[in-house]
A protein has these predicted regions:
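Alpha-helical cap/lid subdomain in secreted, periplasmic
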Residues: 1-140
């Protein structure tokens, strides 16, 4: 099994190299992602692939201009979802998972799930693992 979660660092690169909201290069992201998947399949044609949606929450640095950065993250997520379909991979909707958790009235604050808006806490990782097992575990 090849399980891949990438995308947020692409946002971080754009965020760190600019003075304000900029666009992420989704064409390059897709080309690089395809290269990884194609080379993996070439090495092991039987590999089962799991592709995870990148995610952010409005915590830490993402709070400023969150709507813009979230739209950029969603663009990357759409690429991942498309590739999952093309490569017959399992798709893990992690942004959807964290959106649902963020809107749960029992959540004390968003940093309960992600301490900086990018990196999950232990509680966030637990929910990700549960989703992974639900979607992938039955196919093992």
């Amino acid at each position: 099994i090849l399980s891949v979660l990438v995308g947020v660092n692409d946002l971080l690169d754009v965020y760190n190299k600019t003075d304000g909201p900029q666009e992420v290069d989704t064409a390059r992201f897709e080309a690089d992602y395809r290269d990884i998947l194609d080379r993996s399949r070439a090495q092991n044609p039987e590999v089962r692939i799991v592709l995870a949606e990148p995610f952010i929450l409005p915590v830490g640095m993402w709070q400023e201009h969150y709507t813009h950065w979230r739209a950029q993250c969603d663009r990357l997520g759409a690429v991942v979802k498309k590739l999952a379909k093309e490569y017959d991979a399992v798709f893990l909707p992690y942004q959807g998972l964290f959106d649902k958790l963020a809107h749960d009235a029992r959540t004390p604050k968003l940093s309960y799930w992600m301490w900086d808006g990018t990196h999950p806490t232990a509680a966030g990782h637990e929910k990700m693992a549960e989703l992974w097992m639900q979607r992938v575990g039955s196919k093992l």
